[in-house]
Regions:
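Short, charged cytosolic
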Residues: 1-8
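Cytosolic juxtamembrane amphipathic/interface segments immediately preceding
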Residues: 9-24, 253-266
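Short, composition-biased linear "edge" segments at structural boundaries
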Residues: 45-49
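Glycine- and aromatic-enriched membrane alpha-helices
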Residues: 54-509
Length: 509
């Protein structure tokens, strides 16, 4: 209390000083003048201008559908970016499971195929696949000319939908190279890539996904493929099989029935990491195919089913590998969960968790059986592209006719494919859906194989499909590209010699 009294006494004493009173007065006067100027500006200029602008420009009414379309477009683009990111997974998977002397070749082919896909899918591929024409091919919208701002009834911006579907086409193109690693010429790869992304994929894909595709509109029970077990993976896997047949096996590849076995992968860590990146990208592949961020129930169900099928497939392949060899096989487990992802891609919207679990188990089994079948038939598939994508895709397509739960449908602007409830055999739906799925899968498989064999042997006739024996023994990295992914090694034939730099021994000197 005494301290407060002393401070008050000092203030009273200072206030008696006329110089201090003058300074305080000037300070308050300046503050008052500044405040009056600000108030004048606000009341005489800023406020009337703002009120006048508001009265002259009425607030536009919010269009609810415009907001919905914007949200759905953003969701589709996010999914597209995830799917495109799968290219990283593909090149790592292929490079890791192949030999080291082919790693640069795999990456260059992956980049070149992506660029070819982008150009061809813009010029005519998208028109062939997604625009109206007839039941077999689209005939409008070449180079995206004359098309509306949004695609169909989805409300998604057309260019965003194109980016999403370009990523799908690029996935199919990348799958095709998997069984051809190690002996396919680079020029031959470029030639058949044009045929795949420019013709085979979009034309046959139109049958299932085009607005008037004959598979999508056949009979009272149509063929269904939600995110591409058939359209993307079966087509890609079948083309890969045709390429492996046309090329023949790699030099030095001896099959089990002849006393040999698969050539070892050069880096299983890279390969398995690539597989996990692919799994991550699948969360754009399947959930993004709803094309609707507001279909929250569908997105959640698709994401869950995708996860569960991959897990059950991976466990199945892992356990099966141990039963057969008493070893826990990393490569087989990786291909196992990938086959589960491929299989669930078609039915993921229409099945419940129980169905997804068993579809994944089926995927884990068929991929092992498929690898054994190729080995017996002496077909060289270095990474298992055919069992994972072709056989896994066929199984997933048929599984819809067995496990569709009969209670999921989305009467929203997400396309006719998910607007109808689908019921499988095991849920009381009879054989109708299974028949439709069998017809669609069989037709696509046979048509793709015929077209792919014609394409591969056509490219082979040019002399560019397979490299020379000398080039294959040298390694595609050096032979085709003049570089190596591992510059500290000299790759020559089947041997690798590490290069060392001599270092002066100070102690010996």
């Amino acid at each position: 209390m005494s301290r407060i009294q002393s401070v008050g006494a000092r203030l009273r004493a200072n206030w008696k000083n006329p110089e201090i009173r003058r300074h305080v007065g000037l300070l308050f006067l300046g503050k008052a003048i500044g405040l009056s100027i600000v108030l004048t500006l606000i009341t005489r200029w800023f406020l009337p201008a703002m009120l006048g602008a508001q009265s002259a420009t009425p607030t536009p009414a919010l269009d609810p559908m415009a907001a919905v379309n914007a949200i759905n477009t953003a969701w589709t683009l996010v999914a597209a970016f995830l799917v495109f990111g799968m290219q990283v997974g593909f090149v790592l998977l292929e490079a890791g499971f192949a030999r080291s002397r082919e790693s640069v070749n795999i990456l260059v082919e992956g980049i070149a195929d992506t660029c070819i896909c982008g150009v061809t899918f813009w010029l005519w591929g998208f028109a062939f696949m997604f625009e109206p024409g007839n039941g077999f091919i689209g005939l409008h919208g070449f180079a995206l000319q004359g098309l509306p701002a949004t695609y169909g009834t989805t409300g998604v911006a057309l260019l965003a939908f194109w980016v999403f579907q370009f990523a799908f086409a690029d996935t199919c193109s990348t799958i095709t190279s998997g069984a051809m690693i190690g002996r396919c010429g680079f020029v031959g790869d470029l030639l058949y890539s044009v045929g795949v992304t420019g013709f085979i994929y979009p034309i046959i894909g139109h049958w299932a996904w085009g607005p008037d595709g004959w598979l999508a509109t056949m009979g009272p029970i149509a063929f269904h493929d939600f995110a591409g077990s058939t359209v993307v993976h079966t087509i890609g896997g079948v083309i890969s099989l045709a390429g492996a047949i046309a090329l023949g096996p790699r030099l030095g590849r001896v099959f089990k029935r002849d006393g040999g076995g698969p050539m070892p992968a050069h880096d299983l860590i890279i390969g398995a990491a690539g597989g996990l990146i692919l799994w991550f990208g699948w969360y754009g592949f399947n959930p993004g195919s709803t094309l609707s961020a507001l279909d929250t129930g569908g997105i959640g169900r698709v994401s869950f089913n995708t996860t569960l099928a991959a897990c059950s497939a991976g466990l199945t392949a892992l356990i099966y590998s141990y039963i057969r060899t008493k070893k826990w096989d990393l490569a087989l487990t990786t291909n196992g969960f990938l086959a589960g992802l491929v299989a669930i891609t078609c039915p993921c919207y229409w099945v419940d968790p129980v169905g997804a679990f068993f579809i994944g188990i089926g995927g884990g089994l068929v991929v092992v059986w498929g690898i054994d079948a190729l080995e017996y038939l002496r077909i060289d598939d270095p990474i298992g592209a055919v069992p994972v994508h072709m056989i896994g895709g066929i199984w997933g397509t048929l599984s819809l006719g067995l496990f569709a739960a009969g209670k999921y449908g989305a009467p929203t602007p997400t396309g006719a494919d998910v607007s109808t409830v689908v019921t499988g055999l095991f849920y009381g739906g009879g054989l109708g859906t299974l028949k439709a799925q069998f017809i669609g899968s069989a037709v696509v498989t046979v048509a793709t194989f015929a077209a792919a064999m014609a394409l591969m042997y056509g490219v082979k006739a040019t002399g560019t499909l397979r490299v020379t024996a000398e080039g294959e023994l040298e390694g595609l990295d050096l032979h085709e590209h003049g570089s190596s992914a591992y510059p500290e090694y000299m790759i020559s034939g089947s041997e690798s010699v590490i290069l060392t730099i001599p270092v002066k021994d100070d102690a010996a000197a």
